[in-house]
Design a protein with these regions (language model features):
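Short alpha-helix
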Residues: 156-173, 179
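Conserved Class I S-adenosyl-L-methionine
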Residues: 178-231
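Conserved alpha-helix/loop element of class I SAM-dependent methyltransferases that forms part
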Residues: 1-14
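Conserved class I S-adenosyl-L-methionine
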Residues: 15-22, 115-145
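A short glycine-rich, Lys/Arg-flanked "PGG" loop and its adjoining helix->strand segment in the class I
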Residues: 100-115
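Class I SAM-dependent methyltransferase SAM/SAH-binding core
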Residues: 27, 31-74
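A conserved beta-strand element that flanks and buttresses the S-adenosyl-L-methionine
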Residues: 88
């Protein structure tokens, strides 16, 4: 979905103004900048931003990648209102204090017609993973816990169902365009089995693509990817 948005924007030649909230060392930002877009990376970690600066400099992208230190809720203070064509918020909503407040901040910096790429941890995947690990009590806890956690030792702060994350997005004033599952079955397949099967990895990738937007498989994904637009 994200590649399609960037490719569509690239046809005009001007490129996009992109904000990568929680972008860290630039795993998404640097390739996006290399594609001709302008990227502002917001992250609370000075070490990650220093690594981003080095990575950008090595590729001659200093003019396209701009680093800001702060949290997601700082976004409206650090980035002008209605200035972003695209905001990436990947694996961030799980750890913020208030997901609704965080998405409201994103809405403020998006231009009308601008898009949000949101990636969050899926609740159902945690339930299934704990059950397959022989931990039915933890699976039951993840199923009923308001935050989708399987117990005190769970390192995740919260997980989402497709319905919950879509409700948050629409509550922030955005319109959901697409919802896809990421790693629907990939985390359940032993890599040794794929290595032993000729073409196994390619076949798994094709299966992932086929399952990613189909219910009920999408709901089982390790992560949920939501693409939304500001009306």
């Amino acid at each position: 979905m994200l590649s399609a948005v960037l490719a569509e924007a690239g046809t005009g030649g001007a490129g996009l103004d992109v904000v990568d909230a929680g972008g860290g060392t630039g795993g998404f930002a640097v390739p996006i900048a290399e594609a001709g877009h302008r990227v502002t990376v917001l992250d609370p970690s000075p070490d990650s931003l220093a690594a981003l600066a080095r990575r950008s400099a090595e590729r001659g992208l200093e003019h396209r990648v701009h680093a800001l230190q702060g949290d997601l809720t700082d976004l409206p203070v650090l980035v002008p209102a209605a200035s972003a064509d695209l905001v990436l918020c990947h694996s961030v909503l799980e750890v913020v204090d208030d997901p609704a407040e965080a998405l409201a901040a994103v809405t403020q910096v998006l231009r009308p017609g601008g898009r949000l790429s949101l990636l969050v941890a899926g609740r159902a995947a945690a339930v299934l993973a704990r059950a397959l690990a022989g931990r039915p009590d933890e699976a039951s806890h993840a199923l009923t816990d308001p935050a989708g956690r399987w117990g005190r030792a769970d390192g995740a702060v919260r997980r989402f169902s497709p319905e919950a994350v879509q409700a948050l997005v629409t509550g922030a004033g955005l319109r959901v365009e697409q919802v896809h599952g990421v790693r629907v079955v990939a985390d359940l397949v032993p890599s040794a089995l794929l290595d032993a099967e000729p073409g196994g990895h390619a076949a798994l990738l094709a299966l992932e693509r086929a399952l990613s937007d189909r219910a009920p498989f999408r709901e089982l994904a390790t992560q949920l990817h939501v693409l939304a637009v500001r009306p």
